[in-house]
Amino acid sequence: MKESGEHGETSKAPLNRGVSKGLSVLDLILRFIAIIGTLASAIAMGTTNETLPFFTQFIRFKAQYSDLPTLTFFVVANSIVCAYLILSLPLSIVHIIRSRAKFSRLLLIFLDAVMLALVTAGASAAAAIVYLAHKGNVRANWLAICQQFDSFCERISGSLIGSFGAMVVLILLILLSAIALARR
């Protein structure tokens, strides 16, 4: 009887290694997806500007992302998260090779959570400004600027997509690392 129990345990080990390796490969793929999302968001927001044409050369109205500190924070936050994700790729590759690495997975869970908080703060702050740009605020007497600066508003709205997508991917990465640790 003891032999069959040992036999069952040894046949389970290759299966666990295969699942752990699969989780590590998925982790690497998700990191690449998050890199693309944060990089695209930072570039889209960082290159956004629009100048309204007027009849005179002396009066021009211009909208740039750098006019609003919140949008600048959005670009910086996405850039930091993108840099972190690029720097975490080697660790993710190590997990494919050595799926038993425990400390590095714990480190990634912690740092992924910090980066999730950073990208959430940046995206949420930018989303509030984008909402005000589209709708304005009657009580504060803030007019909606998107009727005049339509391409500016389209770009800043579109840049939020990659950032919110990266938030979802970071949540999945944290869950994936937690599952991989729990399987130990």
UniProtKB/Swiss-Prot annotation:
TM region positions: 25-45, 73-93, 106-126, 160-180
Places the protein is found: Cell membrane
Keyword Transmembrane: yes
Keywords: Cell membrane, Cell wall biogenesis/degradation, Glycoprotein, Membrane, Transmembrane, Transmembrane helix
Membrane topology: Multi-pass membrane protein
Glycosylation site positions: 49
GO CC terms of this entry: plasma membrane
Main localization of the protein described in the UniProt heading: membrane
Record's subunit section: Homodimer and heterodimers.
Function: Regulates membrane-cell wall junctions and localized cell wall deposition. Required for establishment of the Casparian strip membrane domain (CSD) and the subsequent formation of Casparian strips, a cell wall modification of the root endodermis that determines an apoplastic barrier between the intraorganismal apoplasm and the extraorganismal apoplasm and prevents lateral diffusion.
Name of the protein in its database record: Casparian strip membrane protein 1
